[in-house]
């Protein structure tokens, strides 16, 4: 067990020792950078002032530099009407950069839309929301979304060796429970295609805990949290960035980002991003090829109306990886080769792809009223082929496992629509933002899990050879078996209203309610599917009011306390044969904590939470064994420290105790939910040199630490804790950037739980080197 709790106590004590908070006074001119997409970040030498309040050495003396109040609308600063910048009165620290997703000060995003669906300062949201801006992704040279979200406490990403869908099982988790990944505020059900591409990512917003008020679509509203990936959008300044990343295991990734106004008056804007990645992995046989293409067209009158149309074409191909059995890796008296790929090397590649179109229309009627509507059509497919083991321990001791050829095919079509009406107004001593809206989503899901049982067993320890070739299971074969063959339709509808009020500029209250409806039609077609012996139809239709409320109280300038309560509801997917009237999952969260901002240098959130979840499907072997109740309790801290423009520090720590609170699945009450470290944390520091001889150079290093995790529901197997160290050095000019990164610098060897059929683990990536060279104007 790592000594995280002591570390948290030391951090808290250090916080209390910080000198008295000083309220920043308005400066004469706003030190704000309006940055084109491909433009170099502000050079340290050109920033109006230092966070310490004075210019640096060899510069003329100046008055202390302080925050600037945005007394003029920012909504048109980037050449379009952009509601993400509708932040009147927001204090902008010197050097703030305006992006299409909101203002950013170094590593710190000043606002976010994911928590309220309105542009809101993060310090006024009574819930933990963390933002990973583009500046962090660039400095750390993150190569996957999973790597980027490790900067946030109590968040675990999808294993990058996995392929296929990541719905209820095997996806991202927040505070110990499954979290849904959203794309630009709309559901991204199953998250297929190249889900780790970062070329089109402006920022990643992580909202912790259920938030049914604002999020529906797919199978329903998130239960553990929402991870909203915010895309890059066009601006009115032409720019280009193109680059190439090379790395360990034949890693090759060319990428581009082109932003170009198409009309002389800059009312027609276009942006196109894309990348292609080819790499081997640290597992034998597995080779990945993936690409992502993202064209975006914006039509705007530059004052109060904008229409944006986003396209997405993304695909991932690789040999399906199933992990390794727990016995022989983290348990048992023998050790398998951690690089072993189970299955013949000639196995055909699996694939996961998505094609989608998203349209967003924004219009401001007057200074009070505005309207927004989003709509998306998506075509998503995944075909996963494997020769797989079925158990964590040998079927034929001491070291031989039985195998099956298994194909999991899924085809989804999704349509989502989400209109919103917003009003901003003053009433007596209050500033108010009222939001009302509706959403509708329909997902059709055609899927099967077919097997061929006629595969010879293999000794996985002693020079394993796989004599039976992989072939797609066919009903014509005498050894064919279908575990599941279903047609599903998930229809979600919701009406919601929300009021945000700031009272006497000190108390920030949020309250809302959603009337949510989830309709599930589930048809099991194959007569011998798991637990079903004739074609059978399941379904449920549930309507429920889901509240959310909370408040932030500013104790003194720069220090606030907050508390909140929220609920979520989601369809219980993949619950074949359990019940003909399966009720949706539900969750309830209570959260309390404090937020601080000390002179725009040390900022962060410290929180404690309690989440209770009902009707949770639990995978046991090849199917869902039962519906369980689970509870997650814990605490966390997310800090950013930027004492000067040279230094940028991220520190996060989370403690999560997530357990089964009943024994309906056959697991003892009190067992821990697998795949969740009890303690985890991230620390990263970056330094930019401004000495004349080293100007343009920067260096950084960090560490990620996670404690042990259970592999299975019965808590029989457990992976040890581990840590990884990464480092980078970079050189940047106005047009060129070169960076060199090392990940897992110490070559730590470790395993993590891998969601497959229960009882599997995956090896962690070894030491890897990456070099990136890019050009921009």
Locations of regions flagged by a protein language model:
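Acidic, small-polar-rich N-terminal luminal/periplasmic segments of exported/outer-membrane proteins
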Residues: 37-237, 592
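Outer-membrane beta-barrel translocator/receptor signature
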Residues: 200-202, 212-295, 301-305, 355
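Acidic/polar loop-and-plug regions of large Gram-negative outer-membrane beta-barrel proteins
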Residues: 277-281, 293-364, 377-412, 456-484, ...
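Structural signature of Gram-negative outer-membrane beta-barrels, strongest in the C-terminal barrel
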Residues: 300, 412, 431-443, 486-613, ...
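Face-selective signature of the C-terminal outer-membrane beta-barrel domain
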Residues: 357-380, 404-524
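Membrane-embedded beta-barrel scaffold of Gram-negative outer-membrane proteins
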Residues: 362-376, 380-388, 561-562, 584-661
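Gram-negative outer-membrane beta-barrel transporters
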Residues: 505, 610, 626-713, 772-776
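C-terminal beta-signal and adjacent terminal beta-strands/loops
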Residues: 704-712, 730-777
């Amino acid at each position: 067990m790592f000594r995280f709790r002591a570390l948290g106590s030391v951090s808290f004590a250090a916080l209390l020792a910080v000198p008295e908070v000083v309220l920043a006074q308005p400066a004469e001119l706003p030190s704000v950078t309006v940055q084109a997409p491909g433009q170099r970040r502000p050079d340290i030498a050109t920033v109006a002032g230092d966070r310490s309040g004075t210019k640096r050495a060899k510069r003329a003396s100046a008055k202390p530099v302080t925050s600037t109040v945005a007394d003029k609308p920012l909504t048109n600063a980037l050449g379009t009407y952009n509601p993400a910048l509708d932040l009147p009165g927001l204090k902008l620290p010197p050097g703030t950069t305006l992006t299409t997703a909101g203002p950013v000060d170094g590593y710190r995003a000043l606002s976010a839309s994911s928590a309220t669906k309105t542009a809101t300062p993060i310090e006024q949201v009574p819930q933990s929301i963390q933002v990973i801006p583009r500046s962090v992704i660039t400095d750390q040279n993150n190569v996957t979304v999973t790597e980027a979200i490790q900067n946030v406490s109590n968040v675990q990403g999808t294993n990058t060796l996995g392929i296929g869908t990541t719905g209820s099982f095997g996806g991202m988790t927040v505070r110990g429970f499954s979290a849904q990944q959203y794309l630009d505020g709309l559901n991204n059900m199953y998250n297929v295609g190249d889900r780790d591409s970062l070329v089109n990512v402006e920022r990643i917003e992580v909202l912790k805990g259920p938030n049914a008020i604002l999020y529906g679509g797919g199978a329903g509203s998130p239960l553990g949290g929402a991870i909203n990936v915010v895309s890059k959008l066009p601006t009115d300044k032409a720019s280009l960035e193109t680059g190439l990343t090379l790395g360990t295991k034949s890693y090759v990734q060319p990428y581009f980002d082109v932003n170009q106004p198409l009309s002389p008056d800059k009312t027609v804007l276009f942006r196109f991003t894309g990348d292609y990645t080819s790499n081997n992995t640290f597992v034998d046989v597995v080779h990945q090829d993936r690409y992502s293409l993202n064209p975006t067209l914006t039509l705007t009158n530059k004052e109060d109306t904008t229409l944006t149309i986003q396209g997405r074409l993304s695909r991932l191909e690789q040999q399906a990886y199933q992990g390794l059995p727990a016995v022989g890796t983290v348990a048992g008296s023998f050790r398998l080769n951690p690089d072993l790929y189970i299955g013949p090397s000639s196995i055909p590649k699996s694939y996961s792809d998505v094609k989608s179109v998203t349209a967003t229309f924004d219009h401001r009627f007057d200074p009070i009223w505005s309207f927004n509507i989003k709509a998306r059509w998506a075509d998503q497919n995944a075909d996963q082929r494997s020769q797989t083991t079925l158990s964590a321990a040998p079927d034929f001791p001491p070291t031989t496992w039985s195998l099956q050829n298994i194909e999991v095919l899924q085809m989804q079509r999704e349509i989502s629509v989400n209109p919103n009406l917003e009003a901003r107004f003053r009433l007596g001593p209050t500033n108010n933002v009222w939001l009302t809206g509706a959403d509708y989503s329909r997902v059709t899901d055609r899927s099967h899990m077919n097997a061929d049982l006629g595969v010879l067993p293999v000794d996985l320890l002693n020079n394993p050879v796989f004599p039976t070739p992989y072939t797609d299971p066919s009903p014509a074969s005498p050894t064919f078996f279908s575990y599941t063959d279903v047609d599903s339709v998930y229809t979600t509808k919701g009406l919601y209203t929300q009021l945000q009020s700031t009272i006497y500029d000190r108390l920030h209250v949020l309250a809302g309610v959603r009337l949510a409806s989830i309709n599930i039609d589930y048809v099991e077609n194959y007569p011998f599917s798991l637990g079903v012996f004739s074609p059978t139809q399941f379904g449920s239709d549930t309507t429920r009011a889901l509240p959310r409320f909370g408040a932030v109280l500013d104790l003194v300038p720069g220090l606030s306390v907050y508390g909140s309560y929220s609920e979520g509801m989601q369809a219980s997917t993949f619950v074949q044969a359990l019940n003909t009237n399966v009720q949706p999952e539900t969750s309830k969260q209570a959260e309390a904590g404090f937020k601080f901002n000390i002179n725009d240098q040390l900022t962060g959130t410290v929180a404690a939470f309690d989440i209770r979840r009902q009707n949770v499907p639990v995978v046991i072997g090849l199917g869902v064994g039962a519906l369980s109740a689970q509870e997650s309790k814990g605490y966390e801290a997310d800090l950013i420290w930027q004492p000067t423009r040279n230094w940028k520090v991220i520190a996060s720590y989370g403690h999560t105790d997530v357990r089964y609170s009943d024994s309906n699945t056959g697991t003892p009450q009190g067992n821990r939910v697998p795949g969740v470290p009890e303690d985890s944390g991230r620390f990263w520091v970056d330094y930019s040199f401004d000495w004349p001889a080293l100007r343009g150079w920067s260096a950084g290093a960090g560490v990620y630490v996670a404690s042990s995790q259970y592999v299975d529901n019965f808590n029989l197997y457990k992976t040890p804790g581990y840590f990884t160290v990464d480092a980078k050095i970079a050189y940047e000019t106005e047009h060129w950037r070169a960076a060199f990164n090392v990940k897992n610098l110490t070559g730590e060897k470790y395993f993590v739980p891998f969601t497959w059929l229960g009882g599997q683990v995956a090896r962690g990536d070894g030491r890897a080197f990456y070099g990136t060279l890019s050009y921009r104007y």
